[in-house]
Amino acid sequence: LMSANWQMMAMLNILISICGACMMYHTEYADNGMQKMSVLPIRQGSMFFGKFLIAALVLSAMVVIEMAVLVGCAKYWFPSYVFDLTEILKTAGFQIIVTLPTVMLMLVIASACKNMWVSLGIGVILVFTLSILPQDNIVLSLFPFASPYQMLSAAVENSRTALFLAVCGIETVVFGIAEVLYLQVRRCFE
């Protein structure tokens, strides 16, 4: 059931993350909110990571709801289905972790673009470009907008679970560091 539906669910998760990131930063750039927030006694990097935390929590809620729906469908249409909570939690955790680089990169893109439509366009182009790439190529499947399409069952089957978790964790940290550096450079030119 998961393998038949995950591609569409992953695409919806990514599109919702893109829209959320674009709207978060659009509200800051509208009416010069970014300049007003720069005088607050809080670092802009802290605000960015707060936004990332909000986006990660929303993503987690979406994945948990999707897993609950899949379990409900499996129980209804496949009476012989045996509910295994640990397997469902592992799958949900894996899906959240491999999607976090996409969320972080989209927040970085949205913070760099004052026009919401530019960042939204970049995000949508990346989604559809990387969704058509072959998912069996390990290098291409590790790109931020391609990794959410990976499933735990396929990663376990190919012994790539640790690779996906490590690379996605590293990508998330690198994009966070890149945003902090970008904020310092942007502050110099304002």
Locations of the language-model features?
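Helix-loop-helix units of permease transmembrane domains in multi-pass membrane transporters
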Residues: 24-56
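Terminal transmembrane helical anchor/hairpin motif
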Residues: 1, 120-190
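Transmembrane helix-loop junctions in multipass membrane proteins, especially transporters and channels
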Residues: 32, 67, 71-83, 114-115, ...
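Hydrophobic alpha-helical interface/terminus motif in multipass membrane transporters
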Residues: 25, 34, 69, 73, ...
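Structural signal for membrane-spanning alpha-helices in multi-pass inner-membrane proteins
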Residues: 21, 62, 66, 70-74, ...
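Functionally important transmembrane alpha-helices
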Residues: 101-131
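Secretory targeting signals
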Residues: 1-17, 49-113, 153-167
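Transmembrane helix-boundary elements of multi-pass transport/secretion proteins
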Residues: 1-32, 133-135, 178
